[in-house]
Structure formats: C-alpha cells, structure tokens
Amino acid sequence: MNRILILELVTALGFAAVQAAQKPNVLLILVDDLKPAMGCYGDNVAITPNMDALARRGMRFDMAYCNQAVCAPSRFTLMLGAHSTSTGLYGLGSHLRKAWPGAVTMPQHFAKHGYRTESLGKVFHIGHGNQGDPESF
C-alpha cells in the first residue's frame, strides 16, 4: 500500500514539474513615447543592445499601436483589454476602480493563473490623484 502511494506521489510530482516547465516566462515592458527608436526596429543611431537582445530572444511587436493620444488611457486599454470608448477612462485623472470597480486587469489574470506579477513605474499612472491599482499586483 505504501509503495503504491509513494509511486502515485512521485508520478503526480513529475506531472506537476512538466506543467511548470511548459509555462512561459512573461516580461512586459511598457514605455511612454518610445517610438521605434531601438536597434531591433532598424534605428541605426540608437544604441540599445539589451533591448535588442530581448527582442531577438523573445517576441517583438511590429504592429502595436497606441490607441489613445494620452498615455494613461492607452495603458488602461492594454491592462483591461477594452478601449476607452467602453471604459470611460479618457484622461490622466481617470480612476480605474471608480470607473470599473470589478475589472480584472491583465496582471490579475496572470496572477490567477499562477504567475507572480510586479510593477515598476506608472503602469496605472500614479499621480494626478491616482494611487495605482494595488489589486492588480
């Protein structure tokens, strides 16, 4: 009986290890006003060896366009998967949880599926009366 239990446990741990190995790492870098001014986008003047190496090893988006003229609503769109016309988040002073209290953001979705999420900088535009979105990280 104990041998069967140990065999089942080892088998289950083996399957868990295989599943964990199949989950890709995700590093999402958001930069305001970057334009394609990096070597990996063909800029001969920009010296961006680290970003170029990340682009070679990972995924580079060639047709990712800003959907709002203001940075905060554009990031809200990316984090929510919904345009400003749907969310009502148009300006720098927009408050995510006031407009969409039950919203599930991209970081929340990743966390729900076993990822560790972190944020550095103004992903949810801290300032202009905003405090970020602690629920997302």
Question: Which residues does each predicted region cover?
Answer:
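Formylglycine-dependent sulfatase
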Residues: 2-4, 18-137
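Bacterial N-terminal signal peptides
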Residues: 4-16
